[in-house]
Amino acid sequence: MNILYTNFHPGNGGGHTTYLTYLFNGVLSQSINAFIAAPEVSKLNKDLKKNNPTRVFDIDFPGKPKEVVNIIKNIRKLKKIIIKEQINIVHVNGTPDHKVVMLCKWFYKLNFRIIRTKHDSFKIKQNWFADKLYGKYTDQMIVVSNFQYDQVITNDLQKKTTVIHNGIDLEYFHPREKSEAMMRQFNIQDTDIVFVSVAGTALHKGWQFLVEAASNLDDELRSRIKIVLVGNSPTNKVVEQYINQIDMQDNVIFTGFMDDVREAVSIADIGFVLSIGVETISFACREMMAMGRPVLVSDYAGLSENIDNNQDGWIVEQKSASQIQKFLQKIKRLDLIEFSNSANKKSKQEFGLGCFINNTIKVYL
C-alpha cells in the first residue's frame, strides 16, 4: 500500500498540520509506505522534511479560476509523483487539494482511490460540482465528529463516511507542574483563576465571550480572572473592540505563537474552547484535557463530544456571555482537582493515537 497525503495550507495549518503529522508518522511506524505533498512554505512540509526529506513533495494546491496556469503546473507535478511512487491511495484534507487531485485523476485517467477527511463543520453544498467531488471522486470520507456525520445530507455519501475522532500524543501531553517562569513572565499570582486556550486567537474561537463575561463580574472576582490566549496576536482593532473598550486589558494575555504549548497549558486552572464557527472536535481541547485541565467548551459542532458535562469540563451555549458569567460566578465552589483528574482519565481512555491510527488504516483497506 502506497499512500500520498495532501494538504493545501501554505502557513501554520492549525489542526490540519497536527492531524497529518500524527497520521503520517503513525502509518510509517506500521511499515506502510507513505508520502506527503504540501506547499514548500508550509509548517507541515518543513516539519516532516526534517526526518523524511525523500517522502515530502513541494506542491501547491491553487483553486481559483484565475490560477489556471498554476493549477495545471501542479497537476503535472502530482501526476509524476503518483506514477513514480505507484500511489494506490491519495488522502486529501481540504477542498483545494481535493480539486487538484480530482482533476489529476480525471485528466490522466489514473487508477487510485481518493480518501477525504473533512476538517470543518460547513455543510457540503448541493450542486453539480460537489456531486462530482464527493461522488465519483471520493471513495471514502472520514469525519472527525458525530456532528459532522449527522450533517451529511445524502445517503450515498453517508454510507461511505466513517467517524474517527482525532487522537493525540499522550506521552507528549501529560500533567505537569505549573511553570513558575511563565507565571512570573505574565505576572500571574497564585490566587488568580487562570483560563488558557491553545486553540488560536481568531474571533471564531469565541474567546471574546469569556472576556465579556468576566468583565461583568464583581470587582473582587473579576480582578482574579486571567485569560491567556496562545496564538498569533490579533489586530489592534480587535484588541480595542473586545478588550480595551470593556477595560479588560489587565486580564487578557496574548502569548504569541508557540511551537510547544505545554508550558502555557501548565499554568491553567481551566482550559477553554468557545468556538462559534469552523471548529469540529478540537485538538486543543483534547491536549489540554490530557494535561489534566478540565475544559469549558461551547456547544458548537462536535466540541461537546469531548466533554462529560460537569465531570471533566463544562458545556455552555455558543455566543452566550451570560451563561459563561453564571459559570464564573460558581467557580470558587468547584473542586478543580477532581475535575482535573477526570479530564486526564478521559484522555487516557479515549484520546490516544492507537485507535486513531488503526481506525484510519481500516478505511484504507
Predicted features by range, described:
Residues 5-13, 17-19, 23-70, 161, ...:
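N-terminal strand-loop element at the rim of the active site
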Residues 14-22, 193, 197-216, 227, ...:
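A conserved mid-protein helix/loop that constitutes part of the nucleotide-sugar donor-binding site
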Residues 37, 294-297, 307:
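Short hydrophobic beta-strand element within catalytic cores of glycosyltransferases
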Residues 92-98, 118:
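Short His-centered aromatic/hydrophobic patch
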Residues 112-142, 155:
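A conserved, positively charged/aromatic
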Residues 147, 167:
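Carbohydrate-associated surface elements
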Residues 235-238, 249-258, 264, 314-315:
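Active-site donor-binding acidic/aromatic loop of nucleotide-activated sugar
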Residues 309-310, 314-321, 330-335:
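Conserved acidic donor-binding segment of nucleotide-sugar-dependent glycosyltransferases
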